[in-house]
Amino acid sequence: MFIKCCGFQDKDAIETAVLNHVDAIGFITYPKSKRYVSVEEIKSLSKDIPQTIDIVAVVVNLTMVEIDQLIRETSINTLQFHGDESVSFIQEVKEKYPHIKIYKALPANDQLLTNIEAFKNDVDLFLIDTPSKDYGGTGVSYNWSILNALNNIPYLIAGGINIDKIKQIESLNFNHNGYDISSGIETNGQKDKEKIKALLTYVKE
């Protein structure tokens, strides 16, 4: 299973995730998020992460100029579009930066299949998240039954994921590639190294 741990703000937690075989590490560039980090902070936090790991900048409705800066000034190798970005904008980014991997977060709502169909040719990995007017990060799960309709689509399950929920999902036989986890590896809003290690050990062994 592919594991993305998201919302990092300190190097110790990142090091724990890397040592325990995380597949992707996410940084939130959305200023309204409690897990927000600046471009300067991402530059510092990301520089020692191996490039074999997806180093993800989670972006919400950025301009191309802002994306240029992120890619130029940090070690990111993946962009996760988490806003209202159009297919044509993502195509433009992909053409300009063919070496950058593209994730797209989509809400688990009635438009899910339509949205996947629209984006699938330009996206490497989808994240299916809890619907929210505030662009994700709710820490709340949704009704996973909607995922039964997804076949031959690379996607991670997001939205309040923790070890207990992974155990529930394992019995449901979805065709998912893995999980996107943030609040599930935190204690009192801070990344918890023991929770990171426990979750990655459980999934990876």
Give a label for each model feature.
Residues M1-E205:
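Conserved N-terminal beta1-alpha1 strand-loop-helix module at the mouth
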